């Protein structure tokens, strides 16, 4: 891709998200979403093959449908309240349609079917943007309208997302699909706490962004997209492969790693609000995610597959790739648990 074109595209993606997050007018918010959607499609189609084209079309159709629903909700709210200001939705129907539109943009269940297919069909860079940056805009709107969201609707979606995110990833060998199902499950956790403590959603999102960014950077560094190719990475980058074990366990939510913080705090917050059954079910369903992370850990770092002598020397001929941010992100993705006492500000 031409560097000049690349700069324009990435600037538009950043600008689109910023417009959504900072605007107080629904029409500007909608414009930001459209800029965001149209700018990422060239990145998704960077390598022109049928899979990338199919993924781009699926993404475009899903996001366009979600944008139409969003505008429908805005118009219903406008007819009811007479204003375009981004605030809590006064009309229950408008609130429900808006929640469904944003759930479709985020990939919450039952609107999750596009996420694994699209992520699998695009390059690792586009997959990373899709599962991290593209979540910011819809979540910022959900955060703003959280007081008027129907609790039953959002909790049903979140429980389904955690279940689907765990179940869907069980039999996968493609790393991008595993990360997509992991994203669905994490979005479920964020949606569950939204009506109780929206600030905690931001904490969860921050940790999710850090761990997902670190994993995708490691995949890109080793040029791996399947569990089989990942099992050979110890020949190329033994240190990074060892660190990958801790990142995977952190994503699974095991103490004493960073990924345990949001799960612990969300379950604690929901229990404080006299919700016992939901957090119990969420904790049980999180074990499904943990299982496929453990399986990935086992095949990647705890076993050594038979390989030829040529393969063992492969690391000597690897071209050096930029890994400036990686050490910092690895530390943040694994060692933030001791900072938890400082998060009392969230209560």
Curated annotation (Swiss-Prot):
- Record keywords, A-Z: Electron transport, Membrane, Mitochondrion, Mitochondrion inner membrane, NAD, Respiratory chain, Translocase, Transmembrane, Transmembrane helix, Transport, Ubiquinone
Instruction: Answer yes or no on keyword Cytoplasm.
Output: no
One Gene Ontology cellular component: mitochondrial inner membrane
Q: Which InterPro entries match?
A: Complex_I_Subunit_2, NADH_DH_su2_C, NADH_UbQ_OxRdtase_chain2, ND/Mrp_TM
Catalyses which reaction(s): a ubiquinone + NADH + 5 H(+)(in) = a ubiquinol + NAD(+) + 4 H(+)(out)
One annotated GO biological process: mitochondrial respiratory chain complex I assembly
This enzyme's EC code(s): 7.1.1.2
Q: Which GO terms describe its molecular function?
A: NADH dehydrogenase (ubiquinone) activity
Membrane-crossing segments per the record: 1-21, 59-79, 93-115, 149-169, 178-198, 201-221, 239-259, 274-294, 325-345
- The main location class comes to mitochondrion
**Membrane-topology annotation of the record:** Multi-pass membrane protein
Compartments (UniProt record): Mitochondrion inner membrane
Q: Does the keyword Transmembrane apply?
A: yes
Q: Which family does it belong to?
A: Belongs to the complex I subunit 2 family.
Say what the protein does: Core subunit of the mitochondrial membrane respiratory chain NADH dehydrogenase (Complex I) which catalyzes electron transfer from NADH through the respiratory chain, using ubiquinone as an electron acceptor. Essential for the catalytic activity and assembly of complex I.
Q: Could you describe the subunit structure of this protein? A: Core subunit of respiratory chain NADH dehydrogenase (Complex I) which is composed of 45 different subunits. Interacts with TMEM242.
Name-wise, this protein is: NADH-ubiquinone oxidoreductase chain 2
UniProt organism field? Hippopotamus amphibius
Lineage, top ranks: Eukaryota, Metazoa, Chordata, Craniata, Vertebrata
The gene name on file is MT-ND2
């Amino acid at each position: 891709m031409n560097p000049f074109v690349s700069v324009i595209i990435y600037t538009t993606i950043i600008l689109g998200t910023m417009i959504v997050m900072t605007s107080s007018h629904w029409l500007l918010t909608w414009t930001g979403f459209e800029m965001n959607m149209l700018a990422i499609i060239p990145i998704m189609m960077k390598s022109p093959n049928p899979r990338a084209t199919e993924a781009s079309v699926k993404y475009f159709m899903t996001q366009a449908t979600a944008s139409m629903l969003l505008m429908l909700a805005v118009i219903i709210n406008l007819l009811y309240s007479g204003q375009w200001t981004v605030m809590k939705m006064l009309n229950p129907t408008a609130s429900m349609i808006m929640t469904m539109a944003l759930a479709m943009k985020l990939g919450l269940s039952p609107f999750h079917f596009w996420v694994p297919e699209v992520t699998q069909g695009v390059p690792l860079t586009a997959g990373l943007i899709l599962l991290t940056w593209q979540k910011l805009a819809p979540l910022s709107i959900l955060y703003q309208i959280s007081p008027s969201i129907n609790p039953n609707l959002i909790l049903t979606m979140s429980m389904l997302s955690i279940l689907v995110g765990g179940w869907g990833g069980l039999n996968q060998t493609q790393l991008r699909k595993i990360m997509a199902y992991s994203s669905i499950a994490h979005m479920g956790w964020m949606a569950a706490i939204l009506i109780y403590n929206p600030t905690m959603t931001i904490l969860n999102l921050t940790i999710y962004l850090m761990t997902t960014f670190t994993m995708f950077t490691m995949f890109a560094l080793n040029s791996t997209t399947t569990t089989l190719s990942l099992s050979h990475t110890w020949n190329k980058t033994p240190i990074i492969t060892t660190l990958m074990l801790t990142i995977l366990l952190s994503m699974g939510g095991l103490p004493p790693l960073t990924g345990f913080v949001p799960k612990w705090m969300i379950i604690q917050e929901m229990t404080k609000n006299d919700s016992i059954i939901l957090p119990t079910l969420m904790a049980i369903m999180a074990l499904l995610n943990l299982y496929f992370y453990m399986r990935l850990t086992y095949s990647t770092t705890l076993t050594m597959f038979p390989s030829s002598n040529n393969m063992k020397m492969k690391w000597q001929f690897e071209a050096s790739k930029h890994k400036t941010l990686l050490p910092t992100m690895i530390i943040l993705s694994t060692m933030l648990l001791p900072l938890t006492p400082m998060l009392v500000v969230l209560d």
